[in-house]
Amino acid sequence: MTKNIQVLFVCLGNICRSPMAEAVFRNEVEKAGLEARFDTIDSCGTGAWHVGNRPDPRTLEVLKKNGIHTKHLARKLSTSDFKNFDYIFAMDSSNLRNINRVKPQGSRAKVMLFGEYASPGVSKIVDDPYYGGSDGFGDCYIQLVDFSQNFLKSIA
């Protein structure tokens, strides 16, 4: 029997990109009928500025517009995440460096850019939309759907 998969999405503050990735991925898993393959789908940030907060209203707006809801509250990456998750997906190169900097030796988690699952022509880096307008959040959504679908195909 195949072991169930645990996936963690990581950005800087855990209020924009990674909670959107978590919600989008969960939605894509449900649409594909693959819920039984996953034990945990979660997200966190490398920083602790927003711990306990709901996602950015613009993240929630994009999710709602696409029929996706989340109850996520921001949290910070912890050492235990490296033993509890199979995949730790970073949204950008800076996040990836920060994750690898604190990754314990012997960690079982595969740490990588989620964008490694990008379709040709789609940027592998999910830019932080926090300081921009609503368009950036829509762009993130499009990327995250693409990455999610491609990752799910890769494990089928």
Curated annotation (Swiss-Prot):
SMART domains per the UniProt record, alphabetical: LMWPc
Classification via InterPro entries: LMW_PTPase, Ptyr_pPase, Ptyr_pPase_sf, Tyr_Pase_low_mol_wt_mml, Tyr_phospatase_low_mol_wt
Subcellular location: Cytoplasm
Main location per the UniProt record: cytoplasm
Single GO molecular function: non-membrane spanning protein tyrosine phosphatase activity
Keyword tags: Cytoplasm, Hydrolase, Protein phosphatase
UniProt-listed Enzyme Commission number(s): 3.1.3.48, 3.1.3.2
GO-annotated biological processes: signaling
Residues annotated as the enzyme's active site: 11, 17, 128
Record has Cytoplasm as a keyword: yes
GO cellular component: cytosol; nucleus
PANTHER family: LOW MOLECULAR WEIGHT PHOSPHOTYROSINE PROTEIN PHOSPHATASE, LOW MOLECULAR WEIGHT PROTEIN TYROSINE PHOSPHATASE
Family: Belongs to the low molecular weight phosphotyrosine protein phosphatase family.
Function: May contribute to dephosphorylation of 'Tyr-15' of cdc2.
Protein name from the UniProt record: Low molecular weight phosphotyrosine protein phosphatase
Organism per entry: Schizosaccharomyces pombe (strain 972 / ATCC 24843) (Fission yeast)
